[in-house]
């Protein structure tokens, strides 16, 4: 294809010269019709380089493309990790026992089916029957998950199973979309020094010493056709992935092919497959340098290019590969097989791509310069990106009611609709769990039952938080999460929604139908998640809320019975207790002590509730004491965690009496004032001074 400018011709289309063809002109004949270069803008003819602003725009696009590839690699890594976890958690041998759950198979056990892929025996619960063939085919859940990974990672197309590298990397190059170049041995226009030395290596001194009349080959490190933009940058992972496709085609002739690949930055995403695979046609190895062509950068002998035929015309750009006679043209346009470069700027392009019969795309050589990594904040935001989040997560319908008289919050989970499929069969095993923020823990976690194999579950369950005060309603937020239960691995998060309880009016039920949002459970900077709406993961403020460590609450009832002549103390329940055992729970019980000491009859304790942070006791204790003496007494209530073989752990306590303050004093005073009336109050447990449990 000719690059010569015919300023004295009015015809926009031209055919290559029909003079007797030389050996080097066969390529030109194959080029066919071409755009007349006289239609180029004046700026391109003058070879003006890109401005700093344009280079910055290109840099940002390239950096974003590279970051998206890294995020895609991490997404595939998560899929592979899930598959590996399923393989590690197998419980059977696949012969006499189910390969997944380990259940006995055969006459005395469950029905047995054989997986079509791995040929292992599985039970019907762990196998899935597919009906896409004439006869039924059974697959185990591991093989179904493996097929899912192949489908979602693109491995089915590339015939490879990506694990640690990108499935199909894009060669990231710090180049601008430039003009295709013609045959070598054309005079080169001197170009100014590059303004970004970190992206382009220094040019040799030989170029500066050349006279205006000399016609020399280009320096391999320089790229005038790029507008002095830097050489391509290639990551190690990309080089590994594309090594198999370039084993049979080496462009490294005498070190002069380091610049043979020039894809426009705008096409890296769209042409990822074409840019890294050879053309379907025959691959031609380039011929060694001809005697009439420059073989070294310092050569000054002109070749029989277009400039030799038209000495009065100036070529537009200099040749780029002095060691090759036919530089690959598919790479210059970002496509394969002569497809034009879509999306490249027209004022930077002078000709369409070369013919399909040219040599296939070659991978660029590694460059010395590399773009600096993005800032840490951008890296953190990139890690939170999930390319699967384009699909909707579903909607959840629920209602809330704050019962102010009973200090309880009722959350009725009604149903969900259109949940994101999480299993290989296109369904999910959803359940809903609730947390109160700040201070989310097992103590304030409630959950519904799990519904199997559905994306539109209907629960109609009411979950109740006891001991919710007006103060809690002002500062607490309810987090409602929908998860998928996984029998063999970790439960997977589907989506969530949050509601600030201060917006809820007492004793008025409020209904909601809200779309779920995706939230990564980690503390993030405010700027990173500012676009996530009400599902922005709030800072856990356990340490900030009054600097008080929450130990839990206890519901106590007091009544002085004139008929029995004594005080009746009721221990009803505790909520949100602190976890004291390694399993995240406690084995709580409650001790009562009426002070000053009245002997053994002054001490009582409840039964022990195993492995719970929200125990329900419903026990009453009687103290035989006169009403006149009760005002001088104080009731010490303490909650303990029972341990075997060592001393019990103190969880928290409170003291009711004349010397108490706030709600504790008010509760004791109302008991003395209102005889034969049971008065219930919630009290906050505190880590007060206490004696050892007996």
UniProtKB/Swiss-Prot annotation:
GO terms for biological process: calcium-dependent activation of synaptic vesicle fusion; intracellular protein transport; positive regulation of calcium ion-dependent exocytosis; spontaneous neurotransmitter secretion; synaptic vesicle priming. One of its GO terms (molecular function) is protein-containing complex binding. Ca(2+) 2 binds at residues 423, 429, 484-486. The modification Omega-N-methylarginine is found at residue 226. It is found in: Cytoplasmic vesicle, Secretory vesicle, Synaptic vesicle membrane; Cell projection, Dendritic spine; Postsynaptic cell membrane; Membrane. The modification Phosphoserine is found at residues 272, 692-693. Residues 44-160 form the RabBD domain. Residues 202-211 have a biased composition (Basic and acidic residues). Zn(2+) 1 binds at residues 98, 101, 123, 126. Residues 1-51, 166-388 are annotated as: Disordered. Ca(2+) 1 binds at residues 422-423, 484, 486, 492. Residues 1-12 have a biased composition (Polar residues). GO terms for cellular component: dendritic spine; extrinsic component of membrane; extrinsic component of synaptic vesicle membrane; neuron projection; postsynaptic membrane; protein-containing complex; secretory granule; synapse. A zinc finger (FYVE-type) spans 92-148. SUPFAM superfamilies: C2 domain (Calcium/lipid-binding domain, CaLB) (SSF49562), FYVE/PHD zinc finger (SSF57903). Residues 375-388 have a biased composition (Acidic residues). Ca(2+) 3 binds at residues 539, 581, 587, 641-643. Residues 177-186, 352-370 have a biased composition (Low complexity). Gene3D superfamilies: C2 domain, Zinc/RING finger domain, C3HC4 (zinc finger). PROSITE patterns: C2, RABBD, ZF_FYVE. Zn(2+) 2 binds at residues 115, 118, 140, 143. Residues 392-514, 550-683 form the C2 domain. Ubiquitinated. Deubiquitinated by CAND1 to prevent its degradation. Plays an essential role in docking and fusion steps of regulated exocytosis. At the presynaptic level, RPH3A is recruited by RAB3A to the synaptic vesicle membrane in a GTP-dependent manner where it modulates synaptic vesicle trafficking and calcium-triggered neurotransmitter release. In the post-synaptic compartment, forms a ternary complex with GRIN2A and DLG4 and regulates NMDA receptor stability. Also plays a role in the exocytosis of arginine vasopressin hormone. Binds calcium via the C2 domains. The calcium-bound C2 domains mediate interactions with phospholipid bilayers. This is Rabphilin-3A. It comes from Homo sapiens.
